[in-house]
């Protein structure tokens, strides 16, 4: 029964994940959402959203339609190097789908994606996108949640724009380079150089202590950007990686045919391997170490439900 409980919780989480993806696409300016659907209020991580949507493609066909639309209209606002780095944390199937997405990006004229498109992408590029679906002329960088894309449009795609977006998303808190790197996935060296340049230009504040920390004053930036509020930062990448690895496992023969003991062991390994998804986002879930053997399955199902509830209120 415990395994059935996990499977049911996973399906509930899958529906929550699809809802989050649509709300974030709505926030970055696609007309993909259902009329009246609320957009995201937290900052959208563009590369993480692409990978998240690719992982969910078979569960929601419309996501592939909006992804191919983005490959033709908004791909210039994405970092190829960053998405390659983030993709390593997703199930293997996402790697192939990323190559398919990259093929469409190359067809739109962005040659940066050639290294990702692969030699066979043209022959196996996923379902044919439905051309009758209309998602708009291109990204609309209006909503507060689309701030990272807006900063990239203004400052260029790279560490400086994302560093500024991260600092604006933490409400004026002092942040170490290590913390910023955990959120943005840029190297400490790249972020240190970017932060020092921006501090010299007085775009960010640097502390006098060692190791140096950085912050911004949110109010002047909010006024400059003409935003009624600044969207909070969420650590989407580690959370999405946990979600997609978990759902891929629940769909696998390993889960379907395994004993409760083996399934509980794998569930424990998943949570431990992706613990940053919970600690960085402040999601309080049961500790795997507090349960023995198969008894963890019920706690794992609870972890999935808690994560789904957090998604609903935090997106």
For the regions a language model picked out, list residue spans one by one:
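Short amphipathic alpha-helical interaction segments
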Residues: 185-201
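Short, cationic-aromatic polyanion-contact patches
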Residues: 151-160, 208-230
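Long, low-complexity, charge-rich intrinsically disordered regions
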Residues: 1-144, 229-315
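A short, conserved structural fragment
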Residues: 199-209
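Elongated scaffolding segments in large macromolecular assemblies
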Residues: 179, 188-193, 227, 244
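Short acidic, hydrophobic short linear motifs in intrinsically disordered regions
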Residues: 171-183
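Short alpha-helical segments that sit at the start of domains
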Residues: 134-165
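Short, locally clustered residues in the helix-turn-helix/winged-helix DNA-binding domain
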Residues: 165-171
């Amino acid at each position: 029964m415990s395994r059935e409980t996990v499977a049911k919780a996973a399906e509930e989480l899958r529906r929550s994940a699809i809802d989050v993806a649509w709300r974030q696409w709505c926030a970055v300016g696609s007309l993909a959402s259902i009329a009246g659907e609320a957009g995201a209020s937290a900052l959208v991580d563009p590369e993480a959203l692409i990978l998240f949507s690719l992982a969910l493609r078979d569960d929601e066909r419309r996501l592939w339609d909006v992804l191919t639309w983005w490959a033709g209209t908004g791909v210039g606002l994405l970092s190829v190097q960053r998405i390659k780095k983030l993709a390593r944390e997703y199930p293997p199937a996402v790697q192939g789908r990323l190559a398919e997405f990259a093929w469409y990006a190359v067809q739109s004229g962005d040659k940066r994606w050639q290294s990702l498109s692969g030699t066979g992408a043209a022959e196996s590029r996923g379902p044919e996108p439905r051309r009758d679906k209309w998602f708009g002329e291109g990204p609309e960088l209006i909503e507060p949640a689309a701030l990272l894309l807006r900063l990239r449009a203004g400052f260029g795609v790279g560490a400086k724009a994302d560093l500024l977006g991260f600092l604006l998303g933490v409400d004026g808190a002092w942040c170490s380079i290590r913390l910023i790197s955990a959120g943005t996935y840029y190297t400490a060296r790249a972020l240190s150089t970017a932060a020092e340049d921006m501090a010299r230009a007085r775009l960010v504040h640097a502390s006098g202590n060692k190791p140096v920390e950085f912050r911004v004053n949110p109010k002047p930036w909010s006024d400059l950007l003409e935003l009624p509020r600044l969207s909070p930062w969420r650590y989407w990448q580690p959370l999405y990686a946990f979600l997609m690895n978990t759902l891929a496992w629940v769909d696998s023969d390993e889960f379907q045919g395994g004993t409760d003991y083996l399934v509980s062991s794998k569930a424990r390994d998943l949570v431990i391997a992706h613990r940053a998804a919970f600690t960085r986002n402040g999601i309080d879930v049961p500790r795997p170490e507090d349960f023995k053997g198969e008894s963890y399955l019920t706690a794992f199902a609870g972890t999935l439900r808690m994560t789904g509830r957090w998604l609903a209120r935090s997106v």
